């Protein structure tokens, strides 16, 4: 089956055909590092991490670009309010984003360009647009993109100009209210360090210009996939496409957008004040549980983020990790070389078909859980060969989702909380006493100890390699 992806531009699921056979270029709009990362930020990065993993598992060479917007009006305002240099404020929060992305197991991008490191490319693109008649100089060093100069403006979101919301900043300097800033002239009170010299005067780049210039720098005039949150479609992505098309570039061939994380049915966002920071979420559950909660829902469906969502994800993850751990103890892991061997695992056809169907993770997880059921049956009956085969398939599928319990960084994650650690110690102590009773052929005491554990919800399974235990319902 050919990989099919939902293209937001055509509003249809399309066969994915790379621009260059065997290679894929992806540009993902990264963070504007104005504050702490929240759960919504993690959802977007995890969704595209799964895409990258699947493309690579399918044999494609992926170049993944995820930018950092480290110069922005909000960064300047918040840093000034805090009495901190804008660049220090941006860098501090950039590190917080990177740490959060790493914590939930995302692969690093091929390149992670900062906007401030690519101002030269932005000025060159801006000059090109002015020369081609698509941009004009306003007052005070501002440079505006002329939306009426581009016939297909609005094509990404299928809007006519007269019906569009005016979300760009108001200014008497503009020829049309919908025109947007390519460059913002230095204003009184702005820090001199947050500006660069151009033929049009000193200032700083507009948000939309930044992404077009960085995408061109790393992926060229035309590339395969542009991604981001659904809230970026307009005006950001519409304006990115407009700039790049006006410059004569093909830009993105497929547009992918992930849905929101919601709280109480509303988008989780800083502006609404209903968000949970990444640090707060990671303080509630292990990082792998948070990843499972965000990755287990189709990327185009919203995730309602509640305590029940996290609790369900925790139970499911512990069931997954429990099987993998028990099976690996009996049969050994897939191989000592870990990732290399997992990449060679033949994945179940139904799993492949689900992932090729616009990354249908929900259907893929149904296949995963069926193989875990078969694996548990094999373990119970002592069929080591069948258990090993199921372990191989399960770990291969989990690797695609970034959820393999035996891979970094998840080794030991299922028992990482202090409570689970304490339970481990107590249960292992009782099992040691039971083992001693069995060795002494004190069957009554051995049975009593097992009943004691059962009353506490701990299920004990005896096997040739010793007793294994799980918590009932996990």
Swiss-Prot record:
Localization terms from the record: Cytoplasm
CDD domains, A to Z: CysRS_core
Binding site for Zn(2+): 29, 211, 236, 240
Keywords: Aminoacyl-tRNA synthetase, ATP-binding, Cytoplasm, Ligase, Metal-binding, Nucleotide-binding, Protein biosynthesis, Zinc
Record field: catalytic activity: tRNA(Cys) + L-cysteine + ATP = L-cysteinyl-tRNA(Cys) + AMP + diphosphate
Motif 'HIGH' region: where in chain: 31-41
GO molecular function: ATP binding; cysteine-tRNA ligase activity; zinc ion binding
Source species, domain of life: Bacteria
Pfam families: CysS_C, DALR_2, tRNA-synt_1e
Required cofactor names: Zn(2+)
GO aspect biological process, one term: cysteinyl-tRNA aminoacylation
Subunit note: Monomer.
HAMAP family in alphabetical order: Cys_tRNA_synth
UniProt protein name: Cysteine--tRNA ligase
Phylogenetic lineage: Bacteria, Bacillati, Actinomycetota, Actinomycetes, Micrococcales
Encoding gene (name): cysS
